[in-house]
């Protein structure tokens, strides 16, 4: 039954009529790999987590987001709900590691269950961050579709991308 609901909701993503809400980057499952690339945990939490979301919200057309191809007439961005979760991350120092880090669909589901969405119409899209790896210059995120009406996970897929840009903020955007 849940799968039928998810399939029906996901078909709406491509109909051009359903409101699509970009929810932002969810860092609750993330690790920042390569201590040399992330030297200031305080600034990472208090500046970069919110600024990466703000950058994607304000300049989404500039970035190659998968959402740009959905042709939604009712496209919005609202990163404030996820920023509450990102702001609540404790011990950001523990998120900076040398090594590897992987999450799976169960971890994404765990993250989505914590979403308290202020809007209840349409389909939300979040990027659940698995890792920003400064050694490999690679970002790994789970592109995640969520029902705004009940917060259920509709679909998620792991994606990797090369980090590039000038300065730490733009490098990871």
Question: For the regions a protein language model found, what residue spans apply to each?
Answer:
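Generic structural hydrophobic/aromatic packing signal, biased to beta-strands
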Residues: 20-23, 143-145, 151-157
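Surface-exposed short loop/turn segments
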Residues: 85-149
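A structural "domain/chain start" motif
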Residues: 2-95
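Short, low-complexity, polar/charged sequence segments that are solvent-exposed and flexible
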Residues: 39-45, 144-148, 162-163
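Short secondary-structure boundary motifs at beta->alpha junctions and helix caps
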Residues: 149-173
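Solvent-exposed loop/turn segments at secondary-structure junctions
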Residues: 27-30, 130-135, 161-164
């Amino acid at each position: 039954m849940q799968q039928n609901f998810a399939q029906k909701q996901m078909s709406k993503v491509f109909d051009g009529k359903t409101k699509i809400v970009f929810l932002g980057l969810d860092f609750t499952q993330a690790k920042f790999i390569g201590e040399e690339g992330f030297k200031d945990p305080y600034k990472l939490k208090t500046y970069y987590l919110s600024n990466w979301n703000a950058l994607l919200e304000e300049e989404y057309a500039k970035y190659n987001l998968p959402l740009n191809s959905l042709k939604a007439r009712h496209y919005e961005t609202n990163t404030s709900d996820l920023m509450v979760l990102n702001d609540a991350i404790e011990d950001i120092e523990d998120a900076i590691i040398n090594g590897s880090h992987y999450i799976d669909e169960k971890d994404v589901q765990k993250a989505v269950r914590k979403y308290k969405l202020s809007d209840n119409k349409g389909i939300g899209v979040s990027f659940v961050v698995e890792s920003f790896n400064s050694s490999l210059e690679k970002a790994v995120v789970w592109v995640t579709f969520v029902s705004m009406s009940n917060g259920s996970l509709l679909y998620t897929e792991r994606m990797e991308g090369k980090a590039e840009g000038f300065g730490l903020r733009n490098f990871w955007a």
